Amino acid sequence: MQVNISGQHVEVTQPLRDYVLEKLARVESHFDKITNVQVIMKVEKLQQKVEATLQIPGGEVVANAEHEDMYAAIDALADKLDRQLKKHKEKQQSLLQGAAAR
């Protein structure tokens, strides 16, 4: 999995980078076919925003999160990605089971 982390109006420090990689490792443990990840951290007024785009076979998964604290925004983003990938995985499995039943 190739990971690209960038920041707009915020310096991406090593602790922030490590925290993002730790959360992405948790996400990858649920869905191991992620090929590329683009994470963008932004600061707009008083809100910390994080956007992520995951490339997976058959498309991509996009999630956004914002919070007053960057670490909390990263946590919320990881939760959203987890939910979306679980939904995608369940959908793929149900399609395979439906095709096998025919």
Swiss-Prot record:
Q: Which GO molecular function entries does the Swiss-Prot or TrEMBL record give?
A: ribosomal small subunit binding
Recorded hits in Pfam families, A to Z, give:
Ribosomal_S30AE (PF02482)
InterPro entries (alphabetical): HPF/YfiA_ribosome-assoc (IPR050574), RHF-like (IPR036567), RHF/RaiA (IPR003489)
Extract one GO cellular component term from the record.
cytosolic small ribosomal subunit
UniProt entry keywords in alphabetical sequence: Translation regulation
Q: Which Gene3D superfamilies match?
A: Ribosome hibernation promotion factor-like (3.30.160.100)
Quaternary structure, from the entry: Associates exclusively with 100S ribosomes, which are dimers of 70S ribosomes.
Report the function annotation for this chain: During stationary phase, promotes and stabilizes dimerization of 70S ribosomes by the ribosome modulation factor (RMF), leading to the formation of inactive 100S ribosomes.
Can you name this protein? Answer: Ribosome hibernation promoting factor
Q: Which organism is it from?
A: Pseudomonas putida (strain ATCC 47054 / DSM 6125 / CFBP 8728 / NCIMB 11950 / KT2440)
